[in-house]
Amino acid sequence: MEGTFSMNGLIRRAVVAAISVVAMTGAIAAPANAGILTASAKDCGDESLSQPFAQFGDKAQYKLVQGADFEGSMDDWTLLGGAKVVAGNESWQVGGSSDNKSLVLPAGSSVITPASCVGLAEPTVRFFAKKNSGLLSTLAVSVYVKTSLGLVVPVPVGVVLGNGQWKANGPMLIVANLLPLLPGDRTPVAFQFTPLLGSWQIDDVYVDPFRYK
């Protein structure tokens, strides 16, 4: 687990620096050569897996990103621009009937998760989201990966649309699964959520580490 914790700090520092550049340029650039994103992690540790999206027809096994139910500690999260935990859970309470919190992302804010380990076989990220304001607002999702050269780089994952109600976002493919990792390798990644032209809430962020069928 030490590798995961050290990766948390490395990714967090690199991401904050990257966001400072983004704030000045107004855009997130994808790495010029995604083929060099080959760093793997051998010490990611075991995780507790569940099927939080089974009621939506998704029987895959997922693990909760550290703290991503927003019910406890937010250690190792990076909250920027007014992002904060608020009362109000996603409607299905997949994490438990006592869950009653989520993360609000005002316009101009952003959040970066702690590092989570994923494998080669089609890893995906899935979560709940709700648009609070902005007719044309969307929620941008990126993943930060450490390359074989030791660089932490952002790779866009996708954009979420909303209609003012909580919804279980469909599985989003993590670009890291296209990288030339060896079978059995695992690599730590961190996710960034950024609202565009409005305010959003997110809750219960899960990763499918091995894409179980």
Ranges and model annotations:
Residues 56, 60, 148-186, 194-201:
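Extracellular carbohydrate recognition and processing domains
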Residues 98-124:
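Short beta-strands within extracellular/lumenal beta-sheet-rich domains
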Residues 78-80, 106, 117-122, 130-139, ...:
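Extended, low-complexity, turn-rich repeat/linker tracts enriched in Gly/Pro/Ser/Thr and Asp/Glu
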